[in-house]
Amino acid sequence: MLAEIDREVGARLDAAAQAHPNPWEGFRACCLSYLDLALEPEIQRIVLRDAPAVLGQRFRDLDEAASLGPMIESIRELMEGGYIRTGDIEVLARLVNGAVLEAALWVAAGEDPAQRLPRARSTVEILLDGLRLEARGAGRSDGVAPPRP
């Protein structure tokens, strides 16, 4: 069941990213869309509550296996395209992936997830915007692969 939901989530995140011609905006939309999924009952219960509780570290391992590769590729392409600051690609991918996942887990764990979502979104936006190089890469649309947080 978890694998099936993960595939569906991946497809939805890909669609969110592809809806934007600018790779940076697609990346940002993908990360924020993952947070939005924390309000959907099935995803909230199975992916963000039950799976971490039942699987423990195995949940983290599965998340890394599914999302780290695409996140690394997206970070690499955004750096090469001049959209974000340069740095250690793997470390940055792990940090962004972890931040988005932790924010989604926090949203789902609350008594009122809908109240938590705007707080999580605005904070993740601050984090992502801190990576952005405003003057470089503006207006580009060269098709960076979307990440999967």
Predicted regions and their residues:
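C-terminal peripheral helix-coil segments that are non-catalytic and often amphipathic
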Residues: 33-37, 68-81, 97-99, 105-149
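Amphipathic alpha-helical segments used for helix-helix packing
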Residues: 38-57, 109
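Short, solvent-exposed positions on alpha-helices
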Residues: 21, 25, 87-91, 114, ...
